[in-house]
């Protein structure tokens, strides 16, 4: 059995594919797994590190906006897409995958389209409440489309073969909070806030935390992943302390989640899947420039039933926003209620279900 995953650019598009690949290895010994991605995406480093083959497809994304520069750039993108489609078709002919699985990002479009034109079976896994352009266009020819949020189905022209499956996410061992806090050298009795901004960081969140760092670490622990882009700047202004851990990237995310009573982060689909699977209450700050404003759709899917609070990016300038986070961190009863609601939205078996569907498609004749 040969399965090709197409997706990446950010962790939100890559990690669901990685979770499905890991489950396929467990369920089908000897399965051949490879990934198509770009040299500039997170997959360029992560996929080889995880031991999978990576096929590089040069592709650029469309620029948003109506300016002349955006128009000229997009003309070039469309020209480049033809070359990307040709490269993707050559890859499909060479690898002869039984199923091509698309998880979003720029690279998924030429690879999925090439597979469909060459008669290969395709499955699309859509992480967001508002589906990306590739999903909306190519779902029509896909054998199956699996969505993480019920809201996503309303944006698809395809109606048959669409399933509400949830997002496959990284799995973490269940650990007691005291063990997680011990891993960061923290006082195990203090409430703990975990802050991160996705694989690239989040400047607005980082600036808000930096402005209110004294309040955030007064009577509580703080685990703060700044992202690589901001770490150098923040490192010059902040030193780790007894109840502060700061770094560009958290290697031991399992301990970080275990330690946390509350999580402050962007509303990326992979993060939301991890939060709900682990029953973690959260404060979600949607990235305001996300394609189709999909992060706001994601955040509302959790804030509506009470599993999370949603704060707009611009509201982080207001001191009351961080004061609200601090108050929530110390409200144990409300945190428990939010965690229970998060658990009701979880899909811990998503990776196994999707792997099963991929296997079924691969074995069809």
From Swiss-Prot:
GO cellular component: plasma membrane
Membrane topology: Peripheral membrane protein
Entry-linked InterPro entries: GlcNAc_MurG (IPR006009), Glyco_trans_28_C (IPR007235), GlycoTrans_28_N (IPR004276)
EC top class, as a word: transferase
Keyword Transcription regulation: no
Binding site for UDP-N-acetyl-alpha-D-glucosamine: 10-12, 128, 170, 199, 250, 295
Superkingdom assignment: Bacteria
UniProt pathway: Cell wall biogenesis; peptidoglycan biosynthesis
Described function: Cell wall formation. Catalyzes the transfer of a GlcNAc subunit on undecaprenyl-pyrophosphoryl-MurNAc-pentapeptide (lipid intermediate I) to form undecaprenyl-pyrophosphoryl-MurNAc-(pentapeptide)GlcNAc (lipid intermediate II).
Record's protein name: UDP-N-acetylglucosamine--N-acetylmuramyl-(pentapeptide) pyrophosphoryl-undecaprenol N-acetylglucosamine transferase
Lineage: Bacteria, Pseudomonadati, Chlorobiota, Chlorobiia, Chlorobiales
Primary gene name: murG
């Amino acid at each position: 059995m040969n399965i090709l995953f197409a997706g990446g650019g950010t962790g939100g598009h890559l990690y669901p594919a990685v979770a499905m690949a890991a489950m396929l290895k467990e369920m089908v010994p000897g399965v051949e797994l490879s990934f198509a991605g770009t040299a500039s995406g997170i997959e360029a480093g992560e996929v080889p590190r995880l031991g999978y083959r990576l096929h590089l497809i040069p592709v650029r994304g469309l620029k948003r906006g109506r300016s002349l520069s955006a128009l000229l750039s997009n003309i070039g993108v469309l020209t480049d897409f033809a070359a990307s489609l040709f490269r993707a078709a050559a890859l499909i002919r060479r690898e002869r995958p039984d199923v091509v699985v698309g998880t979003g990002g720029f690279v998924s479009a030429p690879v999925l389209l090439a597979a469909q034109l060459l008669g290969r079976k395709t499955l699309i896994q859509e992480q967001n409440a508002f589906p990306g352009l590739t999903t909306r266009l190519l779902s029509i020819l896909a054998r199956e489309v699996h969505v993480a949020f019920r809201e996503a189905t309303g944006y698809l022209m395809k109606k048959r073969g669409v399933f509400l499956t949830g997002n496959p996410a990284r799995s973490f061992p269940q650990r007691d909070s005291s063990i997680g806090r011990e891993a960061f050298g923290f006082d195990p009795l203090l409430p703990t806030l975990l802050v991160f901004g996705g694989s690239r960081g989040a400047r607005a969140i980082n600036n808000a935390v930096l402005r209110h760092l004294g309040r955030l670490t007064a009577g509580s622990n703080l685990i703060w992943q700044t992202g690589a882009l901001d770490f150098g700047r923040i490192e010059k202004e902040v030193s780790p302390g007894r109840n502060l851990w700061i770094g560009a990237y958290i290697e031991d995310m399992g301990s970080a989640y275990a330690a946390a009573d509350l999580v402050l982060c962007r509303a990326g689909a992979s993060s939301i899947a991890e939060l709900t699977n682990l029953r973690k209450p959260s404060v979600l700050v949607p990235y305001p420039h996300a394609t189709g404003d999909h992060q706001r759709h994601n955040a509302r899917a959790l804030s509506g039933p009470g599993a999370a609070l949603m704060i707009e990016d611009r509201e982080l300038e207001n001191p009351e926003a961080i004061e609200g986070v601090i108050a929530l961190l110390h409200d144990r009863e409300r945190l428990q209620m939010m965690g229970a609601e998060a658990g009701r939205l979880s899909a811990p078996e998503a990776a196994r279900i999707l792997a099963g569907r991929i296997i079924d498609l691969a074995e069809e004749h």
